[in-house]
Structures are given as structure tokens and as C-alpha cells.
Amino acid sequence: MSHLVIYNEEGSVLELIKEYEAVSKRLAALGVRFERWKADNELSWDAGQKEVIKAYEEDINRIIKEFGFKSLDVVSLIPENPKKDELRNVFLKEHTHSDFEVRFFVDGSGTFYLHIDDKVYVAFCEKGDFISVPAYTKHWFDMGSKPFFKAIRFFLIPEGWVADFTGSDISLKIPSHDDIASL
């Protein structure tokens, strides 16, 4: 179940929210869009990019029209991937983007950490969750030690994901995806 955990910068829990509407409302107050999408038909894990896009075509077109995205892709990662640790470590570093970061979880799960003011808002996302992180928001992403997810990524610029790392070590103070998933 998707949920939101709010921490102080030292890693102490301030609040745990498990109800979808309350999670969505709290994130909206921060400028973060959080929605639930449903596929037009059931997808297997092996579904390719065309099948995935077709299954969520209505929501994808709505978001593209609203924000003017120039490109999108479908990415996936499984525990057996030999580069999983390398990929995880890149995303675990706090960073910002000059553009907002938009993801939709087709399957599996991942956790977005939003460092806003003196709090860290931890959004555990799973199948059916759409999240949009505002531009210049300090954040990081954890896919866990055994990553399993498939996601649609939306981009305004053809280059896609361009990060500006903050150099902060705050991600070491906040529990990992594996810990958050167990709440």
C-alpha cells in the first residue's frame, strides 16, 4: 500500500500517513501531484513499451497535453540486474532538476524522498501510482536492495534526466526503501 512518512532531518519519524486521499492531499500542499491510474487492460511483467503505453493511453495523453512533455519511456529493473547497485547508488544521492520529475509505476515499487525545508517527505510508491516532483525540489529515489519496478518516465527535454547533485549526505540519515516498504 502506498504511504507517506514524514521525518525530521535527523531521521526521526514525525508522521505516518497510509490513507491514499490523505497522502495525496499532504503531497499536493507541497506542490507534488500524486494520483492513482488504472490500466485499460491487465499487463504482464513482460509487456513492452508499446503495450504499456496503450494500456495507460488516456492518462498519458492527458498528462502530455497538460504539461507538454516531449518524450517518455518505459524503464524496468529487477533484482538480477548486474548493474542494480550502481544504478541505485546514483539515484540515492540528493539532487535537484531544473525540470519537474514525473514517474508512473506500472508495476513494483520505489520510494521518493523529498527534502523540503527541515523535513523529509518519503513517498512509497507502487503499482498504479503517479508522482510529479516539482522543479528544484531537493530529492532522491531509492529502488531498494532488490529492485523490482517498471515505470513510465515523462520528459520536457529530449536529454531526459539531468541532475544537479547537492552534495548533502542526508539520504544516509533517513531509512531506506527496504525499511519504508515494511511499514
Swiss-Prot record:
Q: Does the keyword Membrane apply?
A: no
- According to the UniProt entry, what is the EC number of this protein? 1.13.11.54, 1.13.11.53
What are the recorded GO MF terms, alphabetically?
Answer: acireductone dioxygenase (Ni2+-requiring) activity; acireductone dioxygenase [iron(II)-requiring] activity; iron ion binding; nickel cation binding
Task: State which residue ranges cross the membrane.
Answer: none
Q: What remark does the entry make about the cofactor?
A: Binds 1 Fe(2+) cation per monomer. Binds 1 nickel ion per monomer.
The protein's job, in short, is: Catalyzes 2 different reactions between oxygen and the acireductone 1,2-dihydroxy-3-keto-5-methylthiopentene (DHK-MTPene) depending upon the metal bound in the active site. Fe-containing acireductone dioxygenase (Fe-ARD) produces formate and 2-keto-4-methylthiobutyrate (KMTB), the alpha-ketoacid precursor of methionine in the methionine recycle pathway. Ni-containing acireductone dioxygenase (Ni-ARD) produces methylthiopropionate, carbon monoxide and formate, and does not lie on the methionine recycle pathway.
**Mind listing the GO biological process terms from this record?**
L-methionine salvage from methylthioadenosine; L-methionine salvage from S-adenosylmethionine
Give the multimer and partner information.
Monomer.
Against Pfam families, the record matches this protein to: ARD (PF03079)
Binding of Ni(2+) occurs at H95, H97, E101, H139
Needed cofactors = Fe(2+); Ni(2+)
Keyword line: Amino-acid biosynthesis, Dioxygenase, Iron, Metal-binding, Methionine biosynthesis, Nickel, Oxidoreductase
Q: Which reaction does it catalyse?
A: 1,2-dihydroxy-5-(methylsulfanyl)pent-1-en-3-one + O2 = 3-(methylsulfanyl)propanoate + CO + formate + 2 H(+); 1,2-dihydroxy-5-(methylsulfanyl)pent-1-en-3-one + O2 = 4-methylsulfanyl-2-oxobutanoate + formate + 2 H(+)
Q: In which pathway does it act?
A: Amino-acid biosynthesis; L-methionine biosynthesis via salvage pathway; L-methionine from S-methyl-5-thio-alpha-D-ribose 1-phosphate: step 5/6
Q: What is this protein called?
A: Acireductone dioxygenase
The record's Gene3D superfamilies line, in alphabetical order, gives: Jelly Rolls (2.60.120.10)
So what family is this one in? Belongs to the acireductone dioxygenase (ARD) family.
Query: SUPFAM superfamilies of this UniProt entry?
Result: RmlC-like cupins
The residues listed in the UniProt record as binding Fe(2+), with positions renumbered to this chain, are H95, H97, E101, H139
Keyword hit for S-adenosyl-L-methionine:
no
